[in-house]
Amino acid sequence: MSVHDIGGIRNANRIMRDLKPYLSKTMQGKEYVYYLNKEGHALFGEDGKVVSRGKLAHALLRNEAWLHLFCPDDLQIETDIRYIKNKEKKKIVPDVKFRDEENILHAVEVDRSQKMKVNEEKLKKYEELTQIYKQKHNGKLPVIHFFTVTKYREKKLEELARMYDVFVKVYVIASI
């Protein structure tokens, strides 16, 4: 509502009611969550790939990350970051990537229930990427943003970031 400045709750409900043929609705916590159904995707010329309910919480946290990072325009969802180390091609697939006004790479990882071992493997790759990026971009570092849901996970992620010497910002968003 606040992103699109559509006024009050009654107006928002009226708009959502008008869009009903193109939307699916579910409850998340105590709020309704609306998302495009197959017809809604077709309206925009997309392939009709609908977010499954199992991935809905992940998608919502990714949307919260977008809002928290001031709505970057060039947001790319699950797009590869490719690099070469020791003549071997490697890649990382963050949940989101974008560049800021200084053209610095930002990668966003949404961590709701991922095993810490998987996060550790990701941070090892980000360590490699950081070293290569630093050399290519005059000492500048890529920024890795982790959005998680508990203080415990925040602490563990910060420990791993220190261990692998990666510039990581960890945010706790407990409402999702």
Describe each region flagged by the PLM.
Residues 1-49:
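Nuclease-adjacent, charged terminal/linker segments that flank catalytic cores
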Residues 5-7, 85-89, 115-117, 149-152:
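Acidic-and-aromatic substrate-binding clefts and catalytic sites of carbohydrate-active enzymes
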Residues 31-32, 38-79, 83:
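Solvent-exposed, charged helical/coil patches
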Residues 68-104, 114-116:
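Active-site metal-binding core of divalent-cation-utilizing nuclease and nuclease-like domains
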Residues 108:
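Conserved beta3 VAIK motif of the Hanks protein kinase fold
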Residues 112-163:
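Catalytic cores of nucleic-acid endonucleases
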Residues 138, 163-176:
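Charged, structured surface patches that assemble and position nucleic-acid processing machinery
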